[in-house]
UniProtKB/Swiss-Prot annotation:
NCBIfam families: hrcA (TIGR00331)
Keyword entries, A-Z: Repressor, Stress response, Transcription, Transcription regulation
Main function: Negative regulator of class I heat shock genes (grpE-dnaK-dnaJ and groELS operons). Prevents heat-shock induction of these operons.
Span of the signal peptide: none
Family: Belongs to the HrcA family.
Any one Gene Ontology molecular-function term assigned to this protein's record: DNA binding
Protein name per the record: Heat-inducible transcription repressor HrcA
Amino acid sequence: MLDPRAQTLLKTLIERYIAEGQPVGSRTLSRYSGLELSPATIRNVMSDLEDLGLVISPHTSAGRIPTPRGYRLFVDTMLTVESAADEEAVMRTVKTTLQAGEPQKIVAAAASVLSNLSQFAGVVLTPRRSHVFKQIEFMRLSDKRILLIIVTPEGDVQNRIMATQRDFSPSQLVEASNYINAHFAGLSFDDVRRRLREEIDELRGDMTTLMHAAVTASTDEADTGETVLISGERNLLEVADLSSDMARLRKLFDVFDQKTSLLQLLDVSSHAAGVQIFIGGESNLVPIEEMSVVTAPYEVNGKIVGTLGVIGPTRMAYNRVIPIVDITARLLSLTLSQQ
């Protein structure tokens, strides 16, 4: 446990390093900490913090910079988030961006607003598309071509174009959709397929043909996997900590290209409530030491369905980014639940 003097100096060092990006020396600490300490005393405290693994001294400078362990102590115990006025401004921007519409478009808008507000990369893990349907509708496009409209319980609307062996009249399409909605709504299409096998003798041939075509179109083309949406990757090219080294830059864009590590990290963070901070060099889930990820889960009707966050440098203004992530998650949950 650090004494108050050491806490103040560590907090000042990290705040100055985040603001300026340069190793912080004793003169800067004396100026900004508000403590009446001699340079020698400050150097002694810095030496103690270095022994504790909270700061390090780069070879090229007499100043010090925080370690991942130092950042962790800072965000867990010393961080002061932005003022209520700043949070109100964030809330207004997010509310304006997350307009009612199709869930997939709302989620994509969340990734965009995270990027725009943080000036880093915004990321959203979308919910798995439901195997279950709430309602379907058939619409005749032309001879032997029908548009199948599927509405999921989450409000997602999916369209499939079906090619059939014969033509169907509008009244036949309405009759078929009414029958399916009355008897099968709330089931997965695999369950519908099994039920059709059992009930095939009770249905007319044209009805059976149409239902089988709908089930086949839905299960063949359904995308049930989780998707990572990323917005603002290019913002990170402006961050020297991440882009100044070519090998590091290549690794960064491998993360965005492969997305495997991001999926794992976002999946882990979906199992805990509230904002979580993953710091590179400290968490094995963050593949680059100079990178941090701030995440929060979002919900639909009280059930966690995905995760969103901001990807940026370890040297980010956490006091600004944390409210952005928290507010966006809460407003995304509200918008999706009102659909």
